[in-house]
Amino acid sequence: MLLALAQWLQNDVGFLRVFSYLTFRAVAATITALLIGLVCGPWVIRKLTQMKVGQAVRKDGPQTHLVKSGTPTMGGVLILIGIAVSTLLWADLTNRFIWIVMLVTFGFGVIGWVDDYRKVVYKDPRGMSSREKYFWQSLIGLFAAVYLAFSVSEASNVRVFDLFMAWVRSGLSMGLPARADLLLPFLKSMTYPLGVWGFIALTYLVIVGSSNAVNLTDGLDGLVIMPVVLVGSSLGVFAYVMGSAVYSKYLLFPHIAGAGEMLIFCSAMGGAGLAFLWFNTHPAQVFMGDVGALALGGALGTIAVIVRQEIVLFIMGGIFVAETVSVMLQVTWFKFTKARFGEGRRIFKMAPLHHHFELSGWKETQVVVRFWIITLMLCLFGLSTLKLR
């Protein structure tokens, strides 16, 4: 919005040309989202408290968590407000990638809001049924996957439609340009051609999988938001590189026209996330809830697809992956042993993984900060793939 206004006035007001710089708008987006969160945070928390949307705590979880019962949840709304306002102010609203990542983020946010609402109203920690939640996530994820399959491959909205129609006329068998291939980290000359169907399948798994992985990680005060900020900021660096014809050529990456605007969204997400952490740090005044976790996870997955860094997301989001795998292993092993021996057995003391460490004697703050440190190291490792190829 402000970019369009600046472009209209820059012939008369020369200093407005600074708005054309991605880096300037990225810093501005971070500060804007941060200030919105810090200013609106107390008001949002008061409103959530008045609405009595307190978190229902699992009785079979760590006993230290019982004191958190009643802490207002659905605080992810604060993050989404900061992201929305900051992105709309500072991003190029003619950019197609901005709108698809906004659609996924807020679409998943609505799913999370409904889930949180049911938890609060019915006092049931389970919320929306897994099948219902998965259906709506799949609907949004598949739409985004189909759109991104063609928008990543072309430089303009018109050519995106032309490419889609060419695929239809080919009997759904046409391939995609090389820029849509799966990039293999550390290997500068090796990519894996996905084709349309492979791209759609991978994108769907990345978006929906990331959303649920972040949601599973959101279990302790401040645990998930800092990794989201770190991973999102790192993806913003990739967006800046992939969106630049000069830097992408120098670093031997495919140039994705328009991907640079993802830096603005990542910056807004980082600022909003830090503002939320101000209130979510231990002891938390507010919880993110599914409205925030599902939305942020979906956003990370979508951005990773746009900048062609799906594998790097897997690396940098290693904490999210570990939390998800711990749940899958726990459930699978429990069901297998119950069918085999008549009694379910567990691999971990409790899943997701952060609860296992709590029950092993780690303090909540120790788990949180150590997971932050691990994520920071993984993000630095992921960023190293920019040059170590």
Swiss-Prot record:
Its cofactor is Mg(2+). Signal peptide: none annotated. Keywords: Cell cycle, Cell division, Cell inner membrane, Cell membrane, Cell shape, Cell wall biogenesis/degradation, Magnesium, Membrane, Metal-binding, Peptidoglycan synthesis, Transferase, Transmembrane, Transmembrane helix. Coiled coil: none annotated. It comes from the Bacteria. One of its GO terms (biological process) is cell wall organization. HAMAP family: MraY. Belongs to the glycosyltransferase 4 family. MraY subfamily. This is Phospho-N-acetylmuramoyl-pentapeptide-transferase. It comes from Paraburkholderia phymatum (strain DSM 17167 / CIP 108236 / LMG 21445 / STM815). The gene is mraY.
